[in-house]
């Protein structure tokens, strides 16, 4: 028996109809998928933090290095006598212009200055020399000499953008995003800043976590490329390509 052949025109029509259906089905699937993503994004709330209400110091208690004995220099935070602990000294760029050689050890009139110079071992944009001053190098942060295990605090309300635990570079470090903060250059303008805390011994927060000003976020250490316990404290603006930024 001879099979019936499909006329060429009907055959062409069936192929065209099938292609049309396939294209439509593909487009429809894509449309549904995209709209589902948009709906999902609109349902998930955007993470925000409390508005700016001032700042706090990243370190609340630090040793009076000028009063420590040689043996006490290497003690952890919890082992240093409380009588030799105090508030973090003020950061004053002019202090770095005074050389250590001009400061007589044991002179009570220069005790605070000596302690400040020891505490801020590397100033902003300084180098690693003993008497480094600002803008003598390319260090984009302030190194704060503190014992291992010193509590570290968020300087302002923000969102943890990075909570890295690593053995190289910055070591264990945290980056916090601070939105709508007054600009350092013009307090009438608002911008986004990123504060970073590096070489930590312990990271106590997770990425995406909302933190408040003065909330403890970690413990200081000497992880990464650090050669002694300290806090690498850095602030970057929103134009930095990455955080913490390094040239």
Residue spans of the language-model regions?
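Acidic, glycine-rich catalytic/binding loops that coordinate metals and/or anionic ligands
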Residues: 182-186, 206, 212, 234-247
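Surface-exposed, glycine-biased beta-strand/turn segments
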Residues: 37-172, 181-185, 213, 222
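N-terminal Lys/Arg-rich, disordered targeting/topogenic segments
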Residues: 1-12
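Hydrophobic membrane-insertion alpha-helices, especially the h-region
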Residues: 14-31
């Amino acid at each position: 028996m001879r099979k019936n052949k499909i006329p060429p025109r009907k055959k062409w029509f069936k192929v065209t109809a099938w292609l049309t259906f396939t294209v439509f089905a593909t487009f429809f699937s894509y449309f549904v998928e995209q709209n589902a993503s948009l709906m999902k994004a609109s349902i998930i709330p955007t993470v925000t933090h409390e508005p700016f209400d001032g700042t706090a110091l990243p370190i609340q208690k630090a040793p009076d290095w000028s009063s420590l004995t040689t043996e006490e220099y290497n003690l952890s935070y919890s082992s240093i006598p409380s009588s030799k602990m105090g508030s973090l000294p003020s950061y004053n760029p002019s202090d770095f212009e005074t050389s250590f050689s001009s400061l007589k050890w044991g002179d009570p009139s220069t005790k605070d200055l000596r302690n400040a110079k020891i505490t801020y071992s590397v100033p902003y944009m300084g180098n690693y020399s003993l008497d480094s001053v600002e803008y003598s190098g390319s260090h984009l942060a302030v190194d704060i000499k503190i014992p291992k295990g010193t509590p570290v605090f968020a300087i302002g309300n923000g969102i943890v953008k990075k909570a890295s635990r690593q053995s190289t570079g910055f070591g264990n470090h945290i980056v916090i995003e601070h939105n709508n903060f007054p600009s350092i250059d013009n307090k009438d303008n608002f911008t986004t800043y990123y504060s970073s805390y590096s070489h930590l011994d312990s990271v106590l927060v997770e990425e995406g976590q909302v933190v408040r000003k003065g909330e403890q976020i970690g413990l200081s250490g000497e992880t990464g490329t650090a050669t002694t316990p300290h806090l690498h404290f850095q602030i970057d603006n929103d134009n930095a390509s990455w955080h913490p930024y390094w040239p």
